């Protein structure tokens, strides 16, 4: 029975010392959105609750301002 080593999840924003998550930082936000447009939960990403709330608000704000799409492109 082989045991697989799982990498410990850590909060990227705590490690970087981020105070606020900016809704204009599209590349950072895209890392926390699935290809279907859903926000990835913190139990998968390892983000702390404080930053997960900021992340959700920033993603919703960016969607509202049409910086990122609500869903994937329907072609």
From Swiss-Prot:
It holds the Pfam family Ribosomal_S18. One of its GO terms (cellular component) is cytosolic small ribosomal subunit. Signal peptide: none annotated. GO terms for biological process: translation. Keywords: Ribonucleoprotein, Ribosomal protein, RNA-binding, rRNA-binding. One of its GO terms (molecular function) is structural constituent of ribosome. The keyword Cell cycle does not apply. InterPro entries: Ribosomal_bS18, Ribosomal_bS18_CS, Ribosomal_bS18_sf. The keyword RNA-binding applies. PROSITE patterns: RIBOSOMAL_S18. Binds as a heterodimer with protein bS6 to the central domain of the 16S rRNA, where it helps stabilize the platform of the 30S subunit. Belongs to the bacterial ribosomal protein bS18 family. Part of the 30S ribosomal subunit. Forms a tight heterodimer with protein bS6. This is Small ribosomal subunit protein bS18. It comes from Cellvibrio japonicus (strain Ueda107) (Pseudomonas fluorescens subsp. cellulosa).
């Amino acid at each position: 029975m082989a045991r697989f080593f799982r990498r410990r999840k850590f909060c990227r924003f705590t490690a970087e010392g981020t105070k606020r998550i900016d809704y204009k930082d599209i590349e950072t936000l895209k890392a926390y959105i699935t290809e279907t447009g859903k926000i990835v939960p913190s139990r998968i990403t390892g983000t702390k609750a404080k930053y997960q709330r900021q992340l959700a608000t920033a993603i919703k704000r960016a969607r509202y301002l049409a910086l990122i799409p609500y869903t994937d492109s329907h072609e």
